[in-house]
Amino acid sequence: MYHKIRGTLCGLALVLAGYLVGLATAWIIISQPRVDLIAAHLDPAYASRQIPLLWEVWDIVETDFIGELPDSRTMTYGAIRGALGTLNDPYTAFIEPRQHQRQMEDLRGSFGGIGVTMRRDKDGHVLLSPMPDSPARRAGVQSGDILVSVEGQPITPTVSFDDVTALVRGPVSSSVTIQIWRGDPPTTHSFTIVRQEIMLPSVTWRLVEEQPDVGYIALSRFSDRSAGEIKQAIGELQAAGATRLIFDLRDNGGGLRQAGVEVASQFLQDGVVMYQWGKGGVEESFGVMSGGLATDLPLVVLVNHGTASAAEIVAGALRDNGRARLIGEPTFGKGSVQHIYDLSDSSSLHVTTAEWLTPKRSRLSGQGLAPDITVVRTPEEANAGRDVQLEAAIEALSK
């Protein structure tokens, strides 16, 4: 096989605009495939018949179509998506360069940027809020500043957040010039800011106020840094007096498979974290890694419909190994495995190749994990700031 395997990942289901998007699957990233070798593997008879047919259609459309034609890249991307659509697999997909870059940054847990959060106001303007001790704050950017342009490109209400983010982010140590409006009436200010590595924390933790010996750990995704952050959380909570733990995996759409194995291993003494079934029935097991920091503390895990992929791996491993009960709602149910090929224009191709199972060999695709204690959190409770699932977790640890 001429591809070089770079690493194995579990899918990241991104949460955008309040719904689950992306590919909650196991991923294997592979280096850029060589076009000449791919062509060499094509059936010559197929190539001689079908590829001219594609160009025949293209030529007719280009000559006779009455409307405005998209650019060639858009047409090519559409043709690729059309071909993949015939596979009837929603997780075999083509990912455009910008989205692929964002996924990789999220999985690394860091990116080159200026350290601002962004949101739109009711008029569609992009409002900035600099992070503490960030390049943007040191340069003079203030909360509420309206982003007008980046490197001379106007930022209007029609420019997508993905496009704005791509303009602001860039290589560490490179510089970017932004222009903002401030005040009423607005005055214009320009800042040239040197980008630095901005961390994307995936873990938050605290002692539960009602039960100060209960530690609460929430994990938003599985990135390169997650296992280290979990270790830090466990260590600090134990030092503060925590003797019981709540592990919150709600709305965690997944991430790196290896991070999932490492995180689960912090709570397990031994055993298997997951099994993977490949093409032809080949099975691979992933065992618990030694050195866990919380292998004997009482533990419960919070899950909901947004718990997917690597988060389901971890939740299933903790339950199947008799380590924790699951509290909340049924999980998303994604267990497919993909190869991800980096393509020549920085886009990527995701191809489903296998699926994974829990330690008791439960399949998750299409069914997910049913909680041991079902607690539904209503929108009214969420809006009122009441977390009945967390309340149930605290109660379960007290029994």
Q: Residue ranges of each PLM-predicted region?
A:
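Conserved P-loop NTPase
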Residues: 338-342, 349-377
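Terminal targeting/pro-maturation regions of precursor/exported proteins
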Residues: 2-91
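Intrinsically disordered, low-complexity Ser/Thr/Pro-rich tracts
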Residues: 1-9, 21-45, 149-152, 183-185, ...
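Cleft-lining beta-strand/loop regions that shape enzyme active-site pockets
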Residues: 126-129, 137-143, 151-157, 161-344, ...
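Extended, small/polar residue-biased N-terminal targeting/export presequences
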Residues: 62-128, 175-177, 181-205
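Conserved functional hotspot residues or short segments at active or partner-binding sites
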Residues: 86, 364, 383-384, 388-399
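Generic alpha-helical segment signature
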Residues: 47-54, 223-226, 386
